[in-house]
């Protein structure tokens, strides 16, 4: 076995059954569950994120769930720091960190590290916000196109958070975000096709999804309708009533939430909201599959198979995660 402590990544698209398998693994192994989900971090956003129930969380505690208010932001860099701390604590207790979720950017940040970006600066952000109010975000998008055309091509003018961040990075250091990312790629000596990574762990990577895409689509539609039956609209109404929340926040832009928000604003009918929520979730799953197809060293399992737990345990022994 490797001298490095073990860790397990359990990835997959939304509605694939990751949580159920993670809990089964936690029953079978001395694991500590760590959420890798950019929506589950928010308090008060339970139904639309398919957050495990309070009863399940009491039985299977997850780190990095309910750690932010919906008015707050949370970056991949913050996740990396929090996840590494949670993994270190689990290892110190003699337990295996089991990271489960579908936010692929977070996994990538863990494995490869992040570009050495400057931190957020309140004064610079306030100046950008003032310019946006005076001139509009499209004018700021044109500014970005002059100094960082690659980021401008990637960021929509109606995405103020990412637009502000790209301008902030340039104004703080005089170097574009695109150049910083290229520098990171060139310096990424600790990560290559052989599977080396910047984590001080021996990592086994599992992925779960239905073999047939139409099966996943049916599960997505069924789950979204179940969320509506469980009170999803009332959950978003509580958020909508808060004066400090708006449609531009990362929390409210989460899949499902932005569609219900538009419904509450009178922009969509109930039927349109339902259809668009399902379509948006399917698009999320497609993006997750795109990430996963480019991933190396993944062990895939079929969501519909009845023997995923023994198969996962067998694989973990094969790659020396388990004795």
Swiss-Prot record:
Alphabetic keyword roster: ATP-binding, Magnesium, Nucleotide-binding, Transferase, tRNA processing
Top-level taxon in the UniProt lineage: Bacteria
Cited InterPro entries: Dimethylallyltransferase, IPT, P-loop_NTPase
Molecular function, one GO term: tRNA dimethylallyltransferase activity
Binding site residues for ATP: 12-19
Interaction with substrate tRNA: annotated span: 37-40, 161-165, 253-258, 286-293
Function summary: Catalyzes the transfer of a dimethylallyl group onto the adenine at position 37 in tRNAs that read codons beginning with uridine, leading to the formation of N6-(dimethylallyl)adenosine (i(6)A).
Cross-referenced HAMAP family: IPP_trans (MF_00185)
Subunit structure: Monomer.
Protein name per its UniProtKB record: tRNA dimethylallyltransferase
Gene encoding the protein: miaA
């Amino acid at each position: 076995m490797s001298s490095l402590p073990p860790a397990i990544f359990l990835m997959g698209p939304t509605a694939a059954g990751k949580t159920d398998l993670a809990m089964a693994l936690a029953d079978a192994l001395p694991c500590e569950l760590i959420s890798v989900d950019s929506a589950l971090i928010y308090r008060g956003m339970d139904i639309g994120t398919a957050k495990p129930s309070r009863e399940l969380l009491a039985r299977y505690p997850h780190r990095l769930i309910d750690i932010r208010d919906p008015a707050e932001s949370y970056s991949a860099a913050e996740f990396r720091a929090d996840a590494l701390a949670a993994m270190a604590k689990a290892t110190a207790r003699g337990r295996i960190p089991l990271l489960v979720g579908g936010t692929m950017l977070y996994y990538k940040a863990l494995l490869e590290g992040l570009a050495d970006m400057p931190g957020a600066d309140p004064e610079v952000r306030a100046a950008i916000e003032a310019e946006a109010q005076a001139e509009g975000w499209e004018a700021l998008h044109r500014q970005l196109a002059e100094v960082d055309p690659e980021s401008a091509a990637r960021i929509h003018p109606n995405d103020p958070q990412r637009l502000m961040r790209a301008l902030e990075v340039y104004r703080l250091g005089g170097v574009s975000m695109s150049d910083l990312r290229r520098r990171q790629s060139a310096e990424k000596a600790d990560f290559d096709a052989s599977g080396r990574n910047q984590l001080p762990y021996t990592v086994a990577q599992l992925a779960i999804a239905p073999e047939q895409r139409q099966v996943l689509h049916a599960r997505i539609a069924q789950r979204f309708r179940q969320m509506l039956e469980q009170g999803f609209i009332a959950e978003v109404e509580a958020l909508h009533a808060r004066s400090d929340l708006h449609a531009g926040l990362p929390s409210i832009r989460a899949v499902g939430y932005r569609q219900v928000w538009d419904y509450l604003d009178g922009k969509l009918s109930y039927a349109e909201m339902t259809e668009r929520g399902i379509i948006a979730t399917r698009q999320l799953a497609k993006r997750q599959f795109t990430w996963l197809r480019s991933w190396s060293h993944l062990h895939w399992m079929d969501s519909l198979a009845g023997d995923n737990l023994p198969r996962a345990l067998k694989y973990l022994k094969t790659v020396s995660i388990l004795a």
